[in-house]
Amino acid sequence: MLYDQIATNKRRTGYVMFGFGVLTLAIGAALGYLFWNSWVSGTVIAAVVAVVYMLIMISQSTNVVMSMNHAREIKDVSQAPQLWHLIEDMALVAQVPMPRVFIIDDPSPNAFATGNDPKHAAVAVTTGIMERLNREELEGVIGHEMSHVRNYDIRLQTIALALSAAIGLLVNFASNWFWWGGATRRRDDRDDSAGNIIGLVISIFLIILAPLAASIAQMALSRNREYLADASSVELTRNPQGLINALRKIDDSQPMKAADPNSAALYISDPFKHKQKFADLFATHPPIADRIARLEKM
């Protein structure tokens, strides 16, 4: 059951990332057709923009994310011995280097991992999670976060964020061009054949829906990786009950005050406790009840 869940979630993640890439290139193609009458030119530009954004995000992600969430780094074991030793032990079990350790001064229990790869990873926990969870429960949470590190979820989330930002930049460029009449001038140079009209309609349709589709894809990726990290945490700790109890306590808590909205998908549970009508599409995390139900079957 455990390894089946891990394999299933990895496949789903592959589908989502493939969809992200296709969407980015499709937006580029649409822009190229609208403004330069060339699908290829736009696709190349979109690919370059996406790669540049990814490189910037990957190189700066840890410091930026920790700053946005008001996290302070713990550089010595004496500052938080229990937390330090738990992370050290889980890193050893997961066979990854010891990550940087951060604490967020917030009474709501929560935690997240970020970074580029296991060698440049960081784990942050709130003061609330250290106060409310016992050792067994905290071990389950740290196992979850170290699973994100081991499974390269931290890089996947960074890439997804970069692709979303690239799509937003391209769409913003298109909107400004339309506003100043650039696209109108380009269309004046074309004939009004059925093929050109269909191409224009498809391109405009893609540009309008792209940000929504990117958001849905990013949320789907986050949900799939949460399920995978839960299963991987059990693989590391051999104790599903610890994580189950931790999730129940985290769910039964107040929203965070220190969390940054752009980092919500990184946390082990939605830090703002959003109640979405269309949760399956726009929620950053799967329902806690569903996660617990899966853990109870292990």
From Swiss-Prot:
GO cellular component, one term: plasma membrane
Pfam families the record matches: Peptidase_M48
Transmembrane segments: 16-36, 38-58, 159-179, 197-217
Residues where Zn(2+) binds: H144, H148, E226
Molecular function, one GO term: metalloendopeptidase activity
Subcellular location: Cell membrane
Membrane topology: Multi-pass membrane protein
Protease as UniProt keyword: yes
UniProt key word Isomerase: no
Alphabetical list of InterPro entries matching this protein: HtpX_protease, Pept_M48_protease_HtpX, Peptidase_M48
EC number: 3.4.24.-
Active-site positions on this chain: E145
Note on cofactor: Binds 1 zinc ion per subunit.
Main location: membrane
GO biological process: proteolysis
Cofactor(s) the protein requires to work: Zn(2+)
CDD domains listed in its UniProt record: M48B_Htpx_like (cd07340)
Family annotation (NCBIfam families): PRK04897.1
Similarity field: Belongs to the peptidase M48B family.
Name under which the protein is recorded: Protease HtpX homolog
Source species: Levilactobacillus brevis (strain ATCC 367 / BCRC 12310 / CIP 105137 / JCM 1170 / LMG 11437 / NCIMB 947 / NCTC 947)
